Curated annotation (Swiss-Prot):
Its EC number is 2.3.1.-. It is an enzyme of class 2 (transferase). Transmembrane segments: none annotated. It comes from the Bacteria. This is Uncharacterized N-acetyltransferase YbbJ. It comes from Bacillus subtilis (strain 168). Residues 5-160 form the N-acetyltransferase domain. GO terms for molecular function: acyltransferase activity, transferring groups other than amino-acyl groups. InterPro entries: Acyl_CoA_acyltransferase (IPR016181), GNAT_dom (IPR000182). Keywords: Acyltransferase, Transferase.
Length: 160
């Protein structure tokens, strides 16, 4: 079965599908729905909403942050981007779409942000499934931690 997964910057035509996203009960603990974070991301310079598409249908979402102020609490690398708010709508869980999207991410970032040499993210230490997804997608745990809303978060790094 072919998985035609691609990444695209948010476009207004994605909105109806993004507004209908639902999360699994487990995901509700650790991430936000696109409709909860999209309007804020669109209103702030250096935030880039990205949609995960399956055959041009939105199935996932995340935000890339380039703001030095936002990045400061995660990394001292001025050439890093922060990935946040990754979500996959519940009906598409378990199909490998999130992993495929994370495998596409380095090329996407390199193409649109040629100055970037690292992608960083924070994952809650209790979110084992997400941690495994990121590690299988090339992210590394270099031992850096921070405290988030639900406790300890691991700062993971993907060097480009």
């Amino acid at each position: 079965m072919t998985q035609d997964i691609s990444l695209s910057f948010y476009k207004p035509e994605h909105l109806p599908e993004l507004q209908s996203f639902t999360l699994t009960n487990d995901d509700k603990r650790f991430t936000s729905l696109p409709k909860e974070v999209l309007s804020q991301a669109l209103g702030i310079q250096d935030r880039y909403p990205v949609v995960i598409l399956k055959d041009d249908l939105p199935v996932g979402f995340f935000i890339l942050h380039a703001s030095k102020e936002t990045l400061a609490s995660y990394s001292n690398n001025p050439f890093a981007l922060l990935l946040s708010s990754l979500s996959l709508t519940a009906v598409h869980h378990g199909k490998g779409y999130a992993k495929k999207a994370m495998l596409l991410l380095p090329a996407f970032v390199s193409g649109y942000f040629p100055w970037c040499d690292e992608i960083i993210l924070a994952v809650n230490h209790l979110n084992i499934r997400a941690k495994h997804l990121y590690m299988k997608s090339g992210f590394l745990d270099k031992g850096r931690r921070r405290i988030g809303p639900l406790g300890e978060q691991l700062i993971l790094h993907h060097f480009l």
